[in-house]
Amino acid sequence: MSEEVKEVKILEKPWVEKYRPQRLEDIVGQDHIVKRLKHYVKTGSMPHLLFAGPPGVGKCLTGDAKVIANGRLFELGELVEKVSKGRFGPTPVEGLKVLGIDEDGKLREFEVQYVYKDRAERLIKVRTRLGRELKVTPYHPLLVNRKNGEIMWVKAEELRPGDRLAVPRFLPAIAEEDPLAEWLGYFIGDGHADSKNKVITFTNTDPSLRQRFMELTERLFPDAKIRERIHKNRAPDVYVNSRRAWELVSSLGLAGRKADKVYIPEKGWEGIRSFLRAYFDCDAGVDKNAVVLATASREMAEQVTYALAGFGITSKIREKKVRGKTYYHVTISGSENLERFLSEIGFSHREKLERTLKLVKKPNPNLDSLNVNYELISYVRDRLKLNFSDDKRSWSHRKARKISWELMKEIYYRLDELERLKESLSRSILIDWNEMAERRKEIAEKTGIRADRLLEYIKGKRKPSLRNYIKIAKALGIDLEPTINAMRVFARKYSSYAEIGRKLGTWNSSVRIILESNTEKIKELEEIRKIELELIGEILSDEKLKEGVAYLIFLSQNELYWDEITEVKELKGDFVIYDLHVPGYHNFIAGNMPTVVHNTTAALALARELFGENWRHNFLELNASDERGINVIREKVKEFARTKPIGGASFKIIFLDEADALTQDAQQALRRTMEMFSNNVRFILSCNYSSKIIEPIQSRCAIFRFRPLRDEDIAKRIRYIAENEGLELTEEGLQAILYVAEGDLRRAINVLQAAAALDTKITDENVFLVASRARPEDVREMMTLALEGNFLKAREKLRDILLRQGLSGEDVLIQMHKEVFNLPIPEDKKVALADKIGEYNFRLVEGANEMIQLEALLAQFTIMGK
């Protein structure tokens, strides 16, 4: 198969989305559920529903990407390996929180649901102007600002130089000031620990810094003997003889360490402000435009950018060769950035402080800007008739916030006014002439219009002027003035006489005369009212307008910096990749420098069948794991529930995914919300475990339990997809897919697509390769050899599975547990072996060496087989 065909298979839309059921008939293997749901469609009514069933993977980065988890900086690979214990695929995790952004571009802390490890043959390497470097899978989405001003998630393979990558403007500072952290900053900057003599020296030409280092050393290490030394031919230093200080730097791996290996130790992170100030005092310089920190350690440079982001300071990394050696320059430039650096970190070094203060007064207009979607902003301006005339396509961050905030204030006023105008325009201005005839005498008295004139109006011999018409309506208890005024305001402010005239098929001057004069053309005035009501409805339901308003809200509130992409390059090889699954927002902050990276079927099918083409208007999808809590969910529900369903439906549907992520208190609040809107809203709650849903909610719902699918149901769907995609699906390949899927259709489809990337012929060999599973016959053979007493051959087979096939020990144990029940041995031995497998699995979880433990388990098999 050609490389070109392989790439198409890898990069196209995931098949789990492509073949997601659109109708109830398409749902596989859940006939008992489909039958009940179809009954709801037929009757047009339904109770609240609770969908319970197992979960379903994401886009990935390389392991060297940095990520802040639970307030500490990790390499992504290190973090995932620690949680998964080397296992490939998804591993559930609890209590792990990472930083990400919400829909308004604001930084939030999110719970990670599971970590993920996989392999990839292709990666996309992205470099930016500020020195960021990301290696991600081709279909990994990144949040970018495009040249046309659009802000959108774009697959890595579709990125182009000139696109601007979303970068968090602020990260939470990891800790406050700390004398030990400050001492470490000085030591790593200009200190040295002599491994031979076990003494520490601090070399610096600034007397105040040497004095500060001596004060800290005396305070932190009571056993220290300290001496300041002034030399004739080299820089002065501070000599420290302290067992405690030596043991500290030695325990941190900093004794005798070369400059290209230094890093920020954990104790430095605990007082990162103090560490950075001391480190910058030693190793940073101030040139004509920026503060520049030079280090030979890429690890240190990347950590410093994360630490600076904790104080809202954006920096960039540049490589520089000096006499054949690579150095990394962390650069802080731009007036706003430097000002924040001085206020949050600062210099103790007086000369550096004074030079930086001068730079603050020289702003750089080329930094900290973004491309704006002028076409979309202009559309909002023209649709709502806003007073705005800036036609520049690139704005600074400050300008974007200021202008969008001013526009949003005006937009909120206009939308509120439009809602009020709509309410006024929704009332007809036509009166009941029969009622007027019956009450003619009374109306004459109230209005001062002669009774005979009223009779002429009734018989149609004369038409009343608008002024008299309003008086008559008022006498009948109808106030027309708000409606007439609303018509005039809308025509002047939000539409035009010409637009209304085109709709009416008349001249704009005629419309103006009818609207603005004491006209007698009441029927034409009523037609204008209907047209204006239609136009105002079009404005308020205008999807492009909503998109534009959302865009302006994002500009006014986001906490992002936009870093220009300078290079996009494809890499080929055998890569191990990692991901964190963040439910709800599906993104987190990662990279060598902080960057924003990305990561329901039955409910959607039911909504489509119940509401037809109006399903989008009557269906709201929310995620219960939203970090902002039940109050935000409740507000969205209120906003959605206050309008009537479209298309004749008697209720709307709110789909609440991951409902079991809610706390008990939040579920109680949800119960009250469900009761409050039970008249016109039905809730569908989706969860992995119905036992985690409180009884009061369960009792209000019809419960649907989605069971693992039967092999024949999965096989039918897999054959259909394979035929549709032009694949040759062998029977062995199909059976292998069924084996690894274990009743999960989503997993089966993912495995099929991954195998198709290798070859259009789907064989069992390719399936087991992409699924990171051993062949079941290999596992059975290994266990059989051990039971027959051939321990060395069984051990050789184990090593083949672990090393050649690249599986983890836990993967092998899981398959052994599955296959032990297929062995031709007595039941009591199966029970004993299953118990042993469980025992050794616990040992691996506790961190024991997997090769030793698995060989010991095979030894147990050999003993039991005798």
Curated annotation (Swiss-Prot):
GO molecular function, one term: ATP hydrolysis activity
Gene Ontology terms: cellular component: DNA replication factor C complex
UniProt keyword ATP-binding, yes or no: yes
Keywords: ATP-binding, Autocatalytic cleavage, DNA replication, Nucleotide-binding, Protein splicing
Pfam families per the UniProt record, alphabetical: AAA, HTH_3, Intein_splicing, LAGLIDADG_3, Rep_fac_C
Post-translational events: This protein undergoes a protein self splicing that involves a post-translational excision of the intervening region (intein) followed by peptide ligation.
Domain DOD-type homing endonuclease span(s) in chain numbering: 183-313
GO biological process, any: intein-mediated protein splicing
Protein task: Part of the RFC clamp loader complex which loads the PCNA sliding clamp onto DNA.
Assigned protein family: Belongs to the activator 1 small subunits family. RfcS subfamily.
NCBIfam families hit by this protein: intein_Cterm, intein_Nterm, PRK00440.1, PRK04132.1-2, PRK04132.1-4
Record text on subunit structure and interactions: Heteromultimer composed of small subunits (RfcS) and large subunits (RfcL).
PANTHER family: REPLICATION FACTOR C / DNA POLYMERASE III GAMMA-TAU SUBUNIT (PTHR11669), REPLICATION FACTOR C SUBUNIT 4 (PTHR11669:SF20)
Note: The intein interrupts the potential ATP-binding site.
Descriptive protein name: Replication factor C small subunit
Organism: Thermococcus kodakarensis (strain ATCC BAA-918 / JCM 12380 / KOD1) (Pyrococcus kodakaraensis (strain KOD1))
